[in-house]
């Protein structure tokens, strides 16, 4: 069972809570059109992050620039039903960057094909600080010849950090491309304490 460590202060004593993260992906029909109901931009150590949610859970997390933030603020729509997912995401991301959270519990509701969701679920099952390659994921989902398709599904991930596509490295242990650049990838892996290791797990 994959676990989550969340530290909270109670007086001078630190309490640790471990949460199951094996079923974060909400089951949605591929034909079901789900539009984001609300969005928010907030600051993190790696830059401004845009998050979007629908009535089922978090649907988007990406890096944005200042111009995009201005457009988002002007076109913002709020929905109480989805707003709770944004608050939960901002809290958990903050804990992740402070080093007190090693996995996430916010429900995830991205749109994608069944194959893409299999790949994203395999990524979610990676432990904090754990590496894998496209080939490892293909083996994990019983599609050993679908390495390129796995790479495409990894690239189609729209919930960065939480669905940890940054943990995918080359089979030789070298860093491979990342949508937000190798420097951010190094930052995330360094935060997780594995940036200098060549560990392929699965």
Predicted regions and their residues:
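Basic nucleic-acid-binding alpha-helical/helix-turn surface characteristic of O6-alkylguanine DNA
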Residues: 1-145, 191, 195-202
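Short glycine/serine-rich loop segments
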Residues: 145-189
């Amino acid at each position: 069972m994959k676990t989550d460590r969340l530290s909270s202060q109670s007086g001078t004593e630190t309490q640790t809570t471990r949460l199951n993260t094996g079923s974060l992906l909400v089951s949605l029909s591929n034909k079901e059109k789900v539009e984001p109901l609300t969005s928010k931009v907030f600051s993190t150590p790696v830059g401004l992050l845009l998050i979007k949610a629908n009535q089922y859970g978090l649907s988007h997390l990406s890096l944005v620039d200042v111009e995009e933030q201005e457009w988002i603020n002007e076109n913002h729509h709020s929905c109480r039903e989805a707003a709770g997912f944004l608050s939960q995401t901002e809290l958990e991301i903050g804990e992740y960057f402070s080093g007190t959270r090693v996995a996430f519990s916010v429900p995830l509701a991205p749109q994608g094909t069944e194959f893409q969701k299999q790949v994203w679920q395999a990524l979610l099952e990676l432990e904090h600080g754990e590496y894998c390659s496209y080939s490892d994921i293909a083996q994990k989902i019983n599609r050993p010849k679908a390495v390129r398709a796995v790479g495409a599904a990894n690239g189609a991930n729209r919930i960065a950090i939480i669905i940890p596509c940054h943990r995918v490295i080359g089979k030789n242990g070298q860093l491979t491309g990342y949508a937000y650049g190798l420097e951010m990838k190094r930052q995330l892996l360094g935060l997780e304490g594995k940036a200098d290791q060549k560990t392929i797990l699965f």
